[in-house]
């Protein structure tokens, strides 16, 4: 469960972004612990599109090897919370 209002907001924004990015997916279908591949049917192309949308929306860079390890919506939201809180030039 997200521990702060900011994390909850990130989770909600991420769910909206996922629904907008992945064809035939609605916000209602996306739970915090949904697996991108197993539960939501996100294939490799959709994952690339999602990562690009995340990078554009939050102005961060998500290295491919890191993106590959983020398999649930909650994991992505946690990574985003760390990345947007990190000072410019810091590691996330």
From Swiss-Prot:
Entry keyword annotation includes Lipid biosynthesis: yes
Q: How is it modified after translation?
A: 4'-phosphopantetheine is transferred from CoA to a specific serine of apo-ACP by AcpS. This modification is essential for activity because fatty acids are bound in thioester linkage to the sulfhydryl of the prosthetic group.
Family per record: Belongs to the acyl carrier protein (ACP) family.
Where, per UniProt, does this protein localize?
Answer: Cytoplasm
Protein name as annotated: Acyl carrier protein
The task this protein performs is described as: Carrier of the growing fatty acid chain in fatty acid biosynthesis.
Which positions fall inside the Carrier domain? Answer: 1-84
* Species the sequence originates in: Streptomyces coelicolor (strain ATCC BAA-471 / A3(2) / M145)
């Amino acid at each position: 469960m997200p521990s702060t209002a900011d994390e909850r907001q990130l989770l909600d924004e991420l769910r909206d972004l996922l629904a907008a990015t992945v064809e035939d997916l609605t916000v209602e279908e996306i739970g915090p612990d949904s697996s991108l591949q197993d539960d939501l049917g996100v294939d490799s192309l959709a994952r690339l599109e999602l990562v690009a949308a995340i990078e554009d929306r939050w102005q961060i860079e998500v290295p491919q090897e890191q993106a590959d390890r983020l398999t649930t919506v909650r994991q992505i939201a946690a990574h985003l919370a760390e990345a947007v809180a990190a000072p410019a030039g810091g590691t996330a």
